[in-house]
Design a protein with these regions (language model features):
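Catalytic cores of nucleotide-sugar-dependent glycosyltransferases that transfer UDP/GDP/TDP-activated
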Residues: 1-175
Length: 175
């Protein structure tokens, strides 16, 4: 089975809690069990160690529809312990100095991320059978899939979705 594990944080690249531990270990365990698993997360450039930045592989860039405009998205990758990590880059959203979360525009940041995860599938060789979306930051991935990609064909054919909540206390409620 080919599984894309979408998370807002993953060890060894960025961590604020237990989600990063799971996102860093579960895909590795799935690969060890004979499955194909990759991780996709934001490219928090200020959270990376210099040696992690040096090992980043640029794949491409594209635009992501966000409301009434299109936003730049860079796509990078890196292999760690047999797992491919994909990184969604946009410095406006993810180059922050004071941690991963708690910004006035968190809702918009993860709207962008959720849509970018689906857009990136056009540009990578990995074609998931399942996307496992984790916590509120990735909650729109299955929604956007149903709205915009389900009938698009090609790399979007027959993708199943799993939504995992790691801490029900963090719901990403805005308004």
């Amino acid at each position: 089975m080919r599984i894309l594990y979408a998370a807002s944080e993953a060890r060894p690249f960025a961590a604020s809690g237990g989600l990063a531990d799971v996102a860093g270990s579960l895909p590795k365990a799935l690969c060890a069990a004979g499955q194909e698993a990759c991780v996709v997360m934001p490219y928090y450039v200020n959270s990376l160690k210099p040696e992690q930045k040096e090992k980043m592989n640029y794949i491409t860039n594209f635009t992501v529809p966000v409301g009434w405009r299109s936003q730049y998205c860079g796509l990078f990758s890196q292999q760690v312990d047999g797992v491919t990590y994909f990184f969604i880059d946009n410095e406006f959203y993810f180059k922050r100095d004071n941690g991963l979360y708690g910004y006035f525009d968190d809702a918009e940041r993860y709207v962008f991320f959720s849509r970018a995860v689906l857009e990136m599938l056009k540009y990578i060789q990995f074609k998931p059978q399942v996307i496992n979306s984790n916590d509120w930051q990735c909650a729109l991935i299955p929604v956007y899939y149903d709205l915009f990609y389900r009938n698009a064909g090609g790399c979007y054919d027959n993708i199943k979705h799993v939504f995992t909540i790691h801490n029900i206390g963090y719901q990403g409620q805005y308004g």
